[in-house]
Structure formats: C-alpha cells, structure tokens
C-alpha cells in the first residue's frame, strides 16, 4: 500500500495474486497475471460506482451462455486460449461471429445478445469490464451454473419477484 492506495506491480506481487474485490478503492495490478491465474468461472476484481472488472475462466468446450445486458456496455479481452464470439439483436439470431485469441478485444454494445464460446482444448481466460456495474461487489462464481443461478436471483430481486 502506498499513500493508502493498493499497488500490485512487482514480480513478487504478481506471484501472490489475491482474488478479491478491491473496489471502490484505487487499485493498480498486473491484469494479465490475475486473468491467467484465475481458476473460477467469474470473480470480480474491482467494483466501483459506474464500472466493474471481472476475470473469467471458461473451460474447454464451454461458453458464457447467451446473454444480453439492456443498459450495460461490456468489454472483453482474451489473455489465453481461443474461441468464437457471437452477437446479434435476438437470442436465436446472433448473426455477428468472429474468432478471438490471445490479445483480442471485444466491445459488446448494450442491448446486444452475445455469447463467447471456447472451442479449444484449454481454458479461455478473459477479463471483462462492465459499465455500469453488472454483478454485486465481491462476486465469485466457481462455475457457470453458479453464475446463472446468481444472475436469476439478482434479477428476480431487482424486479420484485
């Protein structure tokens, strides 16, 4: 900690990645180390008032699952692995398709249906930035099923169900 700010920048710090939500405090870190060392489906690393960053590990043959965020723009960056990103105006008609691999970035506009599919034989490691925030502070989803269940619960609460 320097001047009450968390700093992760040395090789020693990189080896000691701590998976927790550091927001909304200032935070500097090795984003590639956090992304590639993450073993969970989704973990929030920083949650602020208007933006959130998560790391994800999508297993070989897995995917994020078709989803759409009506009021959230999303940015994805691939740090390891490869796959296919699909987008479209309807869940059953995602007519935009592109291959992604290490160092590729994806911008997903609010209101677009999308899915990221890992068609390789190794985990697909990505980080995601949401604006505004999509998941509660300190979110950790060990598996996709856990992420889907939490999403359904969060949105049921938001809509008074």
For each predicted feature, which ranges?
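Short hydrophobic/aromatic-rich beta-strand segments that constitute the beta-sheet cores
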Residues: 55, 85-87, 126
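Short acidic-glycine-tyrosine-enriched beta hairpin
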Residues: 90-109
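A short, N-terminal "cap"/entry segment at the start of jelly-roll beta-barrel domains
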Residues: 1-52, 65, 98, 142-161
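Short, well-structured hydrophobic secondary-structure segments
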Residues: 56-64
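Short beta-strand His + acidic residue motifs that chelate non-heme Fe in jelly-roll/DSBH
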Residues: 64-66, 85-87, 108, 114-120
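A generic "binding-loop/recognition-motif" signal
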Residues: 51, 60, 71, 112-113, ...
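Glycine- and acidic-residue-biased ligand/ion/polar-headgroup-sensing regions
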Residues: 71-89
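A short hydrophobic beta-strand segment most commonly corresponding to one strand
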Residues: 75, 122-138
